């Protein structure tokens, strides 16, 4: 979120009252099914539900507009609603987050608004019972799976890497390695050893890591065959869905056993389960060394899926986001190993600084596109699972309308800043405020659907 907020740090300061479409407060109904409104009869019928996870702050307000103005007037769908706003997570002792993940397991598709992960300041601000864990982490721990980030490309938004003319999707194995490691400071000379004690009672194995002649640091880390296998299945499934080649990067020349295990598991699963489908789609899987892969990515035009270990994915996903231009144009989809269950959301946070301006009654210029794409990616997947071609076409049409709207020159301040520089842009000359931009997308969508 910090990167996104830096991009959009300069807000529209024009005076004005709260936009008419914006809810007056953060609170919302917590029931799983919200009251049905009266919409046109010619909506696309959707047979099975989608789980909706509401969120916090500015993204929550935009989320409501997207649902009421862009989705529900055209799609007749049952939404299993869960309020993951921080006040309700606190009120339910975070049970609502667990319930939303279990519902996603049941219905296979979820769309999620950005949420606050509380720190000490948020605990004080919201008078929370405790510092609740990241809802994304809780959901991921229940569902498993891999988070794939993919940029939304608009031709008129400059890229730091101009050659990236097609998207690059990065899949991060968000389990183990450095993030679950045990590290320590050795404050004197001594021997650092690793010991493995098998549960079956067989012989203990011991490795001497280093003999410290003086102070230093040490670390032990791990991963599991089960987690690596789930990661591999998610990556292969996603590549087949996108019809893009898949690259997996490690440093197995140095970590021969550790990274070599990643390489071997991926290859075994590919050969056994996915090679036929890859050949059928004329795509390929390839393992590469991480340093070679980074160089190849910079030279490439895009159009592939990149599977990264935990640390590599953490670093490289931020590089990709900046290289493509903006976190406001980055989607995030959690894909489970079954290839059927997904949860889609925006890659950015709740846009707190804009929400503070909104609370003062001032208009903002907040980019809603990644939140719109959370809805479209979820609906498109629902359509694929159900064989609902009308729903798939609608989701693709809404995405196309968003991109074409930006390419026509109508955009929010963060995107205008990418083109002209934030210090040079002016309201209604280079960018629109939030409500006007959303209204423009709505008008363009209505026009596009009317042409069908």
Curated annotation (Swiss-Prot):
GO CC annotations?
A: cytosol; extracellular exosome; mitochondrial matrix; mitochondrion; peroxisome
- Binding of NADP(+) occurs at 115-117, 122, 299, 349-354, 367
Effect listed in the UniProt record for changing residue 413 to Q: 20-fold decrease in Vmax
> N6-succinyllysine modification sites?
80, 106, 166, 180, 193, 256, 282, 384
Q: Which InterPro entries match?
A: IsoCit/isopropylmalate_DH_CS, Isocitrate_DH_NADP, IsoPropMal-DH-like_dom
Q: Posttranslational modification, per the record?
A: Acetylation at Lys-413 dramatically reduces catalytic activity. Deacetylated by SIRT3.
Q: What is its EC number?
A: 1.1.1.42
Pathology noted in the entry: D-2-hydroxyglutaric aciduria 2: A neurometabolic disorder causing developmental delay, epilepsy, hypotonia, and dysmorphic features. Both a mild and a severe phenotype exist. The severe phenotype is homogeneous and is characterized by early infantile-onset epileptic encephalopathy and cardiomyopathy. The mild phenotype has a more variable clinical presentation. Diagnosis is based on the presence of an excess of D-2-hydroxyglutaric acid in the urine. Glioma: Gliomas are benign or malignant central nervous system neoplasms derived from glial cells. They comprise astrocytomas and glioblastoma multiforme that are derived from astrocytes, oligodendrogliomas derived from oligodendrocytes and ependymomas derived from ependymocytes.
Subunit details: Homodimer.
Name of the featured protein: Isocitrate dehydrogenase [NADP], mitochondrial
Quote the gene name from the UniProt entry: IDH2
């Amino acid at each position: 979120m910090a990167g996104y907020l830096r991009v959009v740090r300069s807000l529209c300061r024009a005076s004005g009252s709260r936009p008419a479409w914006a809810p007056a407060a953060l609170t919302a109904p917590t029931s799983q099914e919200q009251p049905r409104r009266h919409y046109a009869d010619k909506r696309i019928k959707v047979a099975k539900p989608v789980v909706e996870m509401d969120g916090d702050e500015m993204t929550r307000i935009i989320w409501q507009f997207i649902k009421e103005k862009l989705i529900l007037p055209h799609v007749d769908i049952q939404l299993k609603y869960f309020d993951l706003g921080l006040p309700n997570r606190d009120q339910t002792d975070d049970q609502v987050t667990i319930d939303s993940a279990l519902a996603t397991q049941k219905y296979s598709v979820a769309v999620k608004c950005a949420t606050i992960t509380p720190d000490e300041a948020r605990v004080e601000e919201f008078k929370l019972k405790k510092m609740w864990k990241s809802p994304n982490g809780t959901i991921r721990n229940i569902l498993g799976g891999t988070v794939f980030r993919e940029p939304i490309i608009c031709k008129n938004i400059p890229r730091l890497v101009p050659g990236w003319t097609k998207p690059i999707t990065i899949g991060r194995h968000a389990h183990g390695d450095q993030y679950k490691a045990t590290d320590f400071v050795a404050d004197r000379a001594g021997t650092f050893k690793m010991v493995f004690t098998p549960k079956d009672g067989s012989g203990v194995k011991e490795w001497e890591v280093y003999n410290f002649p003086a102070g230093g640091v040490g670390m032990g880390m791990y991963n599991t065959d089960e987690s690596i296998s789930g990661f591999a299945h998610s990556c292969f499934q996603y590549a087949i869905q996108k019809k893009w080649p898949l690259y997996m990067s490690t440093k197995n020349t140095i970590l021969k056993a550790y990274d070599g295990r990643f390489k071997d598991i991926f290859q075994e699963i590919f050969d056994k389960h996915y090679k036929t489908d890859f050949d059928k789609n004329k795509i390929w899987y390839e393992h590469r060394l991480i340093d070679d892969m980074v160089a190849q990515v910079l030279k490439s035009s895009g159009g592939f899926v990149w599977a990264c270990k935990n640390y590599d994915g953490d670093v490289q996903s931020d590089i990709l986001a900046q290289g493509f231009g903006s976190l406001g144009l980055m989607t995030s989809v959690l894909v489970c190993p079954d290839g059927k269950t997904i949860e889609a959301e925006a890659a950015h946070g709740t846009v707190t600084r804009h929400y503070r301006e909104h609370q003062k009654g001032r208009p903002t210029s907040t980019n809603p596109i990644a939140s719109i794409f959370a809805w479209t990616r979820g609906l498109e997947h629902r359509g694929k699972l159900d064989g609902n071609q009308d729903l798939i076409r609608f989701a693709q049409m809404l995405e196309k309308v968003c991109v074409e709207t930006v390419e026509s020159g109508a955009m929010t301040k963060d995107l205008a800043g990418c083109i002209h520089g934030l210090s040079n842009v002016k309201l209604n000359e280079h960018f629109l405020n939030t409500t006007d931009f959303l209204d423009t997308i709505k008008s363009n969508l209505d026009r596009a659907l009317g042409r069908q």
